[in-house]
Amino acid sequence: ACIPRGEICTDDCECCGCDNECYCPIGSSLGIFKCSCAHANKYFCNRKKEKCKKA
């Protein structure tokens, strides 16, 4: 999947389609901030894509 940068996401799989990661700011576990897609790199996403395919 490829959620645009800045859009809310739940995990990296949703953002890695366009080499972004799902970035969760500190405090996101408390529900104050939402995780959103942020710029990552191909190496990061290639590793994640293997996991995402299995999911």
Curated annotation (Swiss-Prot):
It is found in: Secreted. It comes from the Eukaryota. GO terms for cellular component: extracellular region. Keywords: Calcium channel impairing toxin, Disulfide bond, Ion channel impairing toxin, Knottin, Neurotoxin, Secreted, Toxin, Voltage-gated calcium channel impairing toxin. Disulfide bonds join 2-16, 9-22, 15-37, 24-35, 45-52. Expressed by the venom gland. One of its GO terms (molecular function) is calcium channel regulator activity. Belongs to the neurotoxin 09 (Tx3-6) family. The presence of a 'disulfide through disulfide knot' structurally defines this protein as a knottin. Antagonist of L-type calcium channels (Cav1/CACNA1). In vivo, causes paralysis in posterior limbs, and gradual decrease in movement and aggression during 24 hours after intracerebroventricular injection in mice at dose levels of 3 ug per mouse. This is Omega-ctenitoxin-Pr2a. The lineage of its organism: Eukaryota, Metazoa, Ecdysozoa, Arthropoda, Chelicerata.
